[in-house]
Swiss-Prot record:
<feature type="compositionally biased region" description="Pro residues">
    <location>
        <begin position="119"/>
        <end position="128"/>
    </location>
</feature>
<keyword id="KW-1031">Host cell junction</keyword>
<dbReference type="Pfam" id="PF03310">
    <property type="entry name" value="Cauli_DNA-bind"/>
</dbReference>
<dbReference type="GO" id="GO:0044219">
    <property type="term" value="C:host cell plasmodesma"/>
</dbReference>
<dbReference type="InterPro" id="IPR004986">
    <property type="entry name" value="Caulimo_virion-assoc"/>
</dbReference>
<comment type="function">
    <text>Plays a role in virus cell-to-cell and plant-to-plant transmission. Interacts with virion icosahedral capsid and movement protein, thereby facilitating virion cell-to-cell transmission through plasmodesmata opened by viral movement protein. Also interacts with aphid transmission factor, attaching the virion to aphid stylet when the animal feeds on an virus infected plant. Aphid saliva may later detach the virion, inducing release of infectious particles when the animal feeds on a new plant.</text>
</comment>
<keyword id="KW-0946">Virion</keyword>
<dbReference type="GO" id="GO:0003677">
    <property type="term" value="F:DNA binding"/>
</dbReference>
<keyword id="KW-1015">Disulfide bond</keyword>
<dbReference type="GO" id="GO:0044423">
    <property type="term" value="C:virion component"/>
</dbReference>
<feature type="region of interest" description="Capsid binding">
    <location>
        <begin position="122"/>
        <end position="128"/>
    </location>
</feature>
<keyword id="KW-0175">Coiled coil</keyword>
<feature type="region of interest" description="Disordered">
    <location>
        <begin position="98"/>
        <end position="128"/>
    </location>
</feature>
<feature type="coiled-coil region">
    <location>
        <begin position="37"/>
        <end position="58"/>
    </location>
</feature>
<feature type="coiled-coil region">
    <location>
        <begin position="1"/>
        <end position="30"/>
    </location>
</feature>
<comment type="similarity">
    <text>Belongs to the caulimovirus ORF III family.</text>
</comment>
<comment type="subunit">
    <text>Homotetramer, through coiled-coil domain. Homotrimer when interacts with icosehadral capsid. Interacts with capsid protein, and with Movement protein.</text>
</comment>
Length: 128
């Protein structure tokens, strides 16, 4: 996330906070700013909390915020992994391998390279 995205998300949160505050004011206006002695303060608080949670669950912006936050948790290959894979795909031994390998297979540029399997048996055969 860059700073512009974070700033826009902060603005969305601020507007949501203002709407929540207005909803609280509406609820308080419906029930009266101070509950009378006969009403139970706990039930009024429970109603306010349930109304607020309902509003917050129905708000589409919360889904967007959750999606944005979950994008950070997505598995993304890091540059370190790319460099490791690049190193593994390159040949690990680059020194000219003279006098080894099979020229016919392209593993040596030396025409006098060792051949495998050997065409001549070593003397004495089999070795002791």
């Amino acid at each position: 996330m860059n700073l512009a995205t974070i700033a826009s998300e902060i603005e969305v949160v601020k507007t949501n906070q203002k709407t929540i505050e207005s909803k609280i004011d509406q609820i308080l206006a419906k029930i009266g700013s101070t509950p009378d002695e006969s009403s139970n303060l706990e039930s009024v608080a429970a109603k306010i909390i349930s109304d607020l949670t309902k509003e917050m669950k129905e708000c589409h912006c919360n889904k967007e915020i959750v999606e944005i936050l979950n994008k950070d948790k997505a598995i993304i290959p890091s540059p370190e992994q790319d460099s490791i894979q690049k190193r593994l795909s390159e040949p690990q031994y680059t020194f000219p391998n003279f006098d080894v390998g099979n020229e016919g297979m392209g593993s040596s540029t030396n025409p006098n390279a060792l051949k495998w399997p050997p065409t001549e048996k070593p003397q004495p055969w089999p070795p002791r």
